Amino acid sequence: MAVDPYKSGQFKKNPYFAKSDLVGRLVVTLTTTYETRGLQMIAQPSRCICEKQIHELILTDEEGVACGSTVNRIAYVGFVEITEGGVITNGDAVYYNDQLLGHIAGFDETHMPNHYNIVLYAPERKTGEDLGLVPGGRIVIRQVKA
C-alpha cells in the first residue's frame, strides 16, 4: 500500500519549485464570524483545484495554523468560482483584485465533495463584507517564493 508522503514526513522541504497562479472570480460575499468553528485542517498542504469548481474562502487570525490542526476563530469571506485551475499550497498569497486577503493556512473538507474550505491567515479577522468584496471581483492565488 502506498504511503502518503505528507503524513509520513517524507518531504523535508517544500517540493513546489514553481507553479502557475490559480485564478477565479468571487461569486458570493459572506458576512459571518465564529469563535468556536472547529475546522479540521487536513494533513496535506496542497490541493489540485479544477476550472469551474466553486470553493469557500475563510479567514482566521489564529497564529500557528498547520496541517492537522483545528481552527476556531474564523470569518467567512466568500465563494470563488475557478476560471484557471491549478495547484494551491499553504503559504500561497490570496488576492481580491490587487488587495491581499491573506495566505493559505490549510484546507478543511467538512463540505466535500461539494467544496473545500480554503482557510487563510491574516492578522485581522474580517468577513467578505468587512473587506468590501463584491461578486465579480478577481481572485488570484499566487505562490510566495521564500
What would you call each of these model-derived segments?
Residues 1-56, 61, 65:
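N-terminal intrinsically disordered, low-complexity, charge/repeat-rich segments that act as generic
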Residues 60-77, 115:
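Short, basic/aromatic beta-hairpin or loop at an interaction surface
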Residues 77-84:
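Short alpha-helix capping/helix-loop boundary micro-motifs
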Residues 94-95, 140:
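Hydrophobic beta-strand signal
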Residues 97-98, 143:
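Conserved "cap/hinge" positions at secondary-structure junctions
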